[in-house]
Each structure stands twice: as structure tokens, then as C-alpha cells.
């Protein structure tokens, strides 16, 4: 029996596939050795404790095996990855001072416009270093700290960075956490003081331009008691015919009665291995909200984790994944209930077409101490043709009888009746299908600020654009 072919073409990535001429100040040789780690540390003028941390992380990396579950990582050879590439500029706090070639790339991606319209602060990283970082004066006056993490580590906030850095995600967590600990570079540090509630978001944008390189930024956010923050992360890269790697790390500390929303729109190119690690710990009465849109990369392994440590703490995860030709996106979320009366809710959508593979993994752990915990997991999958694949892999470890846990999963395809109805109202078949898919992913887009919801819906329309039949 002949397989049904996808009726849509792959994404038109022209805006994201801008390839700048590589004009780097320094590119370390490919591979992973103690000598390379020492060179990175020297280039970055690390404090002594960080030099030692990097070398210890490398040792752990060499001890830990590559994961034997999930998508195959055989195409990723660290001997061919340059782990540090410094662009041709120092970090600027005035957009006018950013070199024109780098500025042109970010301007095409809409970063300056977004800052002017709707953001309290912006960080822009190009390859291994931040090239721009700025925060509105009225936000800084409230005591909010938003700066590159390396300046924080060497300056006024050195003790705070050292206290929290890779304590939530340790190098021993898994092989790529250890890799991150050895070669990390760039990223942001955020501290929101007690009681400060930011009404507009902060954003960091990560752009990997260098061919055959890796990006390993570290984001550390501390939202103090009674404070609130919305942080947005965006990512993109041009496509090359060799593997690129993204293995960043995000550590989020949500204090008593604080609230943090962490939103991500990832549109890496389809030669990218995206092996990011994100984790939050939530104190009494605190709330962590994850909003995630994954549209790019060749291989993706993304499972944000939340530890609900305090009583009455909450977690919500809302995500959409779109896997097209040549993509294997293995995503999901994890939660550990520790405190009493804690609650978690996962609501995800996955879309696959043209032979794409999407896998949703959920992990719910309820400790004995987590009396009256509540957890609900919902995953819906939409396959646009018979070439594609969608899997749901739930895992639950419930150690108390005093908990309410639920899980549901649905897999389906686009209804011909729905397409016919929309076409009878004047739509083309292509537009009808795109509208249905956009509606399917509405759980994420409605949670984003309008500018980012528009970007996400544009990505969906681009994925669906193409000839019919």
C-alpha cells in the first residue's frame, strides 16, 4: 500500500537562514581536551574557582556515557565542534555601536523593534558571546538586575552567582550538563528584588552563525519573595551541511509567593542538535509557568523540569512542537512534587509532517511528603500524513495515596470535513489546513505577548505553505 504523502512543503527559512561572512576575532580549534578548556577559561578571564569548575566538569563529561534512549546522537561528533567562537565585538549597551554585519542580522529578525515596542530589557548573543545588553532605566531603578552573567560573576554579584551557578543543574545530571559546565559561555543573569512585579518582559535572543560550532549560554534567574517576571528566550541559526550544537542551561529560582513565566520560541536550523537543560525550583506559594514553542533543529531533546519544593507551589507547562522532514523532536516536561498542596499541569500539542518524528515525554514524581498533590497531563498530537510519527511516553512515580493524578493523550489527523467547510467559505485548501493547525497550537500562542504570538503563527503558516496535491 502506497504511503500518503504530505500535502505541504517544508518551511521557508529565508529570514532565519541569513549567513554572515564569518568574521570572528577568535575561534578555538574543534574538540574537547583539558588544553582547550584551559584556553577557553583564559580567553574569558575566569576567576580561579571557575577554571577549576570547568576542568572538573570535563572530567565528569568523560566519565558519563552518552544517553542510550531518545533520538540517535551518532551524527554529533565533539571532535568536529568548535566550543568557543568570539565575534568581532565586545558587548555593547548601545545598539548603534554593534558592528553593522551583526546588527543587520538581528534587525532582520526584529530584535531592535521588539525592544522598542514591548520589552523591559534585551540581551542578544552572537555565537559564544553577548554582543548587546540593555535594560530600561525605570526597570533598573526598581532594583531589577539584568546583565550578562560573566560581568555578574566577576563584579558586584559574584557571591550570588557562585552560590547558585549549576547548583540546580549539576554537571553530574547527564553528559551534556557536564559538557555545558566545561565550555559554557555567555548568557544572562537576572535578579528581581522582593515585591517587584515587572509588567513587561525581559528577553534574550541567541544566534549561532558559525559553521560547525556550539553555543553554550547559561541563564540564571532569581525571582525573590513576592516578585514576578516574564522572561522570553528566542533562538535561531542558518542551516549548514555539518552539525551544530546547542547545549545551553537555564536555572530558575522562584522564591516564596513569587511568579515566573519562562517563554521560549526555538527555531534552530535543521542541522542543529538542540540538547538544552532547563530547571526551576519553586518555594512556598510560588508559581513557575513554562511556555514553549519548538519549530527547529534536526534533533531536539528538551524536558524542562520543575521542583515544587514549597507547600502550595504550582507549575504549568504549555508547549507546541512542529516536526517536519528530517526532524526528530523529543520533548516534554518533568515535575517533582515535594511540598503539600502542590499542583502541576502539562498541556501540549505536537504536530508532525513529511516524515517528522515528535515524541512527548512526561515525568511526574510525587514524594511521600507531597500530601494532597494534584497533577494533570494532557498531550494531543496531529499527524499531517502517514509518513510521520508521533509518540507519547508518560512516566509516573506516585509515593503517596493522598494525591490526585490524571493523564490523557490523543492522536489524530486533519478532518476532511473541516477542510471542506472552510473551503466552502472561500478559503483555499492550503489556507484552510494552515488555519486548522494554527488553531491546534492556540494553547501556546494565546499565552504569548502579541508580537511573539504573531511570530509563532507566521512560523506555522510558513511550515504549511506549499503546493496541494
Task: Show which residues each predicted segment covers.
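Extended intrinsically disordered or low-complexity segments
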Residues: 12-16, 340
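Non-catalytic terminal regions with compositionally biased, polar/charged low complexity
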Residues: 18-22, 44
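Short acidic (Asp/Glu) and glycine-rich catalytic loops that position anionic groups and cofactors
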Residues: 17-19, 34-38, 397-398
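Short, Lys/Arg-enriched, disordered terminal segments
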Residues: 1-5, 468-469
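N-terminal amphipathic, basic helical "cap/leader" segment at the start of enzyme domains
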Residues: 4-7, 11, 26-173, 177-178, ...
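Conserved beta-strand/loop scaffold segments within soluble protein domains that form the structured core
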Residues: 132-134, 138, 142-427, 441-469
Amino acid at each position: 500500500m502506497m504511503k500518503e504523502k504530505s500535502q505541504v512543503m517544508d518551511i521557508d527559512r529565508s529570514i532565519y537562514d541569513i549567513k554572515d561572512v564569518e568574521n570572528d576575532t577568535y575561534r578555538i580549534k574543534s574538540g574537547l581536551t583539558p588544553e582547550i578548556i584551559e584556553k577557553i577559561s583564559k580567553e574569558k578571564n575566569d576567576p580561579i574557582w571557575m577554571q577549576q569548575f570547568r576542568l572538573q566538569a570535563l572530567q565528569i563529561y568523560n566519565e558519563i556515557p552518552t544517553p542510550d534512549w531518545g533520538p540517535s546522537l551518532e551524527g554529533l561528533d565533539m571532535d568536529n565542534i568548535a566550543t568557543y567562537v568570539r565575534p568581532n565585538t565586545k558587548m555593547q549597551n548601545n545598539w548603534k555601536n554593534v558592528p553593522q554585519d551583526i546588527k543587520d542580522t538581528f534587525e532582520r529578525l526584529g530584535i531592535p523593534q521588539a525592544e522598542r515596542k514591548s520589552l523591559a530589557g534585551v540581551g542578544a548573543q552572537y555565537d559564544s558571546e553577548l554582543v548587546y545588553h540593555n535594560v530600561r532605566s525605570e526597570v533598573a531603578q526598581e532594583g531589577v538586575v539584568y546583565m550578562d552573567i560573566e560581568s555578574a560573576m566577576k563584579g558586584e554579584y559574584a557571591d550570588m552567582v557562585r552560590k547558585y551557578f549549576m547548583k540546580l543543574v549539576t554537571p553530574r545530571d547527564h553528559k551534556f550538563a557536564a559538557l555545558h559546565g566545561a565550555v559554557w559561555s555567555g548568557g544572562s543573569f537576572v535578579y528581581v528584588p522582593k515585591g517587584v512585579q515587572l509588567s513587561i518582559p525581559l528577553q534574550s535572543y541567541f544566534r549561532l552563525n558559525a559553521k560547525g560550532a556550539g553555543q553554550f549560554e547559561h541563564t540564571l534567574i532569581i525571582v525573590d519573595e513576592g516578585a514576578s517576571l516574564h522572561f522570553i528566550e528566542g533562538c535561531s541559526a542558518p542551516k549548514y551541511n555539518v552539525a551544530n550544537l546547542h547545549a545551553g542551561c537555564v536555572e530558575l529560582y522562584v522564591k516564596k509567593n513569587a511568579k515566573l513565566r519562562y517563554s521560549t520560541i526555538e527555531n534552530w536550523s535543521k542541522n542543529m542538535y538542540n540538547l538544552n537543560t532547563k530547571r526551576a525550583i519553586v518555594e512556598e506559594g510560588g508559581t513557575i509557568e513554562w511556555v514553549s514553542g519548538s519549530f527547529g533543529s534536526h534533533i531536539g531533546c528538551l524536558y524542562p523540569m520543575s521542583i515544587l519544593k514549597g507547600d502550595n507551589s504550582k507549575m504549568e507547562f504549555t508547549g507546541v512542537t512542529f516536526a517536519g522532514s528530517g526532524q526528530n523532536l523529543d520533548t516534554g516536561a518533568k515535575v517533582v512534587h515535594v511540598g503539600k498542596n502542590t499542583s502541576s499541569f502539562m498541556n501540549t500539542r505536537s504536530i508532525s509532517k513529511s516524515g517528522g518524528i515528535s515524541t512527548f515525554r512526561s515525568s511526574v514524581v510525587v514524594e511521600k511528603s507531597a500530601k494532597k498533590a494534584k497533577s494533570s497531563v494532557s498531550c494531543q498530537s496531529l499527524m499531517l500524513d502517514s509518513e510521520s510519527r508521533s509518540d507519547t511516553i508518560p512516566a509516573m512515580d506516585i509515593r503517596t495515596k493522598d494525591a490526585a493524578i490524571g493523564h490523557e493523550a490523543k492522536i489524530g489527523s486533519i478532518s476532511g470535513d473541516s477542510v471542506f467547510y472552510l473551503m466552502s467559505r472561500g478559503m483555499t485548501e492550503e489556507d484552510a489546513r494552515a488555519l486548522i493547525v494554527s488553531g491546534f497550537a492556540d494553547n501556546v500562542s494565546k499565552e504569548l505577548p502579541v508580537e511573539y504570538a504573531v511570530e509563532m503563527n507566521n512560523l506555522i503558516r510558513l511550515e504549511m505553505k506549499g503546493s496541494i496535491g
